Amino acid sequence: MRELTFEDARAASMGGLVFGAGGGGLERGLEAARTVFQVGSPVLVTLDELEGDDQVMIMTGVGAPGTQQQLVWPRDGLRALELACEAWEGHGAIVGTMTAHPGAFMAGTWLVNALDPHLAVIDCNANGRGHPTVAMGGMGLAGRTDINVVQAAVGGVEDHHGHIEIVARGPIGVVSDILHHASAATGGVLLASRGPFPVDFLREHGAVGAVSACIRLGEAMLQAEGEGGEAMIGAIKDTLGGRELGRGPLRSANVAVRENWDVGTLEVDSGSQLVIHVCNEYMAADIDGKRVATYPDLIVTLAESDGMPTPAAHREPGERIVVLAVPRDKIPLGAGVREAAVYRDPERLLGIELVAHAGAS
């Protein structure tokens, strides 16, 4: 157990930006982190420090990350957690919270831990990298119809489709589809909470050490900050053990919202035909028609100028970018990405094969 600092939050936000493949919005994430440390000092706890039957809640978002209008606020995340805890009828102590996956927003979710010293930040995620569907963060439960989990979602604004609160109990896959449709109805995004999950389950099925991994990467990035794009690119690549797939001007960015997912392709003029397939996350990369990386490999696009990642929806044709890929065995992953069923929607939306390359069954 250790007390987290704002420097940890800065590092977690920077590292989370990469593990989230650019999603989350760094400035907004840092602003939320500042609020956290104005309120209190959360503590980071590893799973090894907890009892097996201790319970952990997940905090996450649902919807399209490219949504531009702010439709959710920190209070919505706190309310979702409150609703999920109230609806839980199990036994054991709820000792902490964790995020579903990393992003620049990660430290902002520590607000509840700063407000309530009895809730620790747990050094685990449902998945240690961004994922396009809640089912991928289901830690292996997406296809289980015999296990019911409480999920709550809150968000929206009154003058834009209205504000909603939803609480549901049922199989993760079914309820996740309901929340995704609800996020579309409110304009694009909701803040959500689900669980709780016992520590013994997280030790086997969660992305153990995901928070520490973000902080380590972020610390390397902060050291490279101000040293130029190549220094930042090198810090990210070397820390994660990744490789460069190519670099050059972005030839096209055909990404649009479909069924409340950001879907499409990016094409990079790297001297070869480098195509990145997008479904909220970078799901696959092809060079001259040959697959070179597939989710859950981490594919990241970095601006050549400063080495920083930005999401697919914000890339502009002509911008010079660098494409990195990090092998899946170098990333903390949850069990959910190994389920073939969770790739159904991305495969359908993209029209490409993922399961055969993803090592899922």
Where does each model-flagged region fall?
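Oxyanion-binding "anion nests"
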Residues: 213-268
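Short, acidic/small-residue loops that bind anionic groups at enzyme active sites
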Residues: 115-135
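Short glycine/serine/threonine-rich phosphate/pyrophosphate-binding segments
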Residues: 26-30, 78, 100-111, 128-132
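Glycine-rich oxoanion-binding loops at beta->alpha junctions
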Residues: 50-93
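C-terminal non-catalytic interaction/assembly regions of soluble proteins
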Residues: 253-361
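A short, small-residue-rich loop immediately preceding and capping a beta-strand
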Residues: 92-101, 120-124
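N-terminal low-complexity or amphipathic/hydrophobic leaders
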Residues: 10-61, 307-329
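A structural-propensity feature for long, helix-poor, extended segments
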Residues: 51-66, 136-182
